[in-house]
Swiss-Prot record:
The keyword Transmembrane helix does not apply. Substrate binds at H54, E263, F319. This is Thiamine-monophosphate kinase. Mg(2+) 3 binds at D30, D75, D212. The gene is thiL. ATP binds at G121, D122, R146, S214. Its EC number is 2.7.4.16. Pathway: Cofactor biosynthesis; thiamine diphosphate biosynthesis; thiamine diphosphate from thiamine phosphate: step 1/1. It comes from the Bacteria. Mg(2+) 1 binds at T46, D47, D122. Mg(2+) 5 binds at D215.
Amino acid sequence: MEYNEFEIISKFFKNHQKKDKNQIKGIGDDSALIKIPKNNLLAISTDTLVEGKHFLKNITPKDLAYKSVAVNLSDLAAMGAKPTWITLSITMPKSDSVWLKSFSKSFFKILNKYKLNLIGGDTNSGPLSITLSIYGLIEGKNALLRGNAKNGDLIYITGNLGESAAGLSLLQKKTFLKNVKICNYLIKKHLKPIPRISEGIALRNIANAAIDISDGLISDLGHILKNSKCGADINLNTIPISKILTDNFKIDEYLNWALNSGEDYELCFTISKKNIKKLNVAIKKKIIKCTCIGYITSAEKGLNLIQNQKKIIFKKSGFNHFI
């Protein structure tokens, strides 16, 4: 069964949540009205996901809904923001009720998990794409930024790198593994990334600079270095790569995935040495799991990769939306 724009909004996206105390007006008027709490900054991020470019054509609506929200949440995590509101715009070839029901159910499930309220959006006809704008609050003025890294800072990564790329390679049938359990694990890492919201909030009073790894470590760390006017030395022997990857793939494969492939949605951040004790407290409390991979240097030294105490040549890569 097909629906028009207003029927889609009414049936699948309106009145699924209670308004929060700062939401004056949500879906149903020309604009949403929200009140920003005193002494808070509002962080805003927008992402568009296009079929065939950002997600595979055979992705289920359930997985698409989850991932579209998760990748936006990751941007808030990189700023140290607490998720609050979201808008959704869907462009789709036809208003398939079965597809919409599955999508909206998964969509509200992740929204409720992270206490996000849908406050508006749009629907249109055309090739499948999802556009989300997400809003988060930051108490005080301690937002995490890309441009605050300092010479001498230590560089850390949360979690492990490369598993999402391995999962995508399996989905695209570029890579094959006999172990079904491992295949399913890696595919899930690609389809259902975990945004590091609590880690980002905890890092507000610890880190100098941060970014989420959406386009690959080399590419995204490069944004920190460019914005901070710094260089970096990275020890490849300390890059956090899971035993699943090291046991099942060649070193060239998993190192390339870890360095150049995106969609891990882990956080890369820098801290001054004086804040190591604060970070260790967060690690001990299991708020953050992270690995030190190098340190910030002066801009003229550039970005250097060190392996077994030797500088190696590498190709700067990463995901590019216009290739």
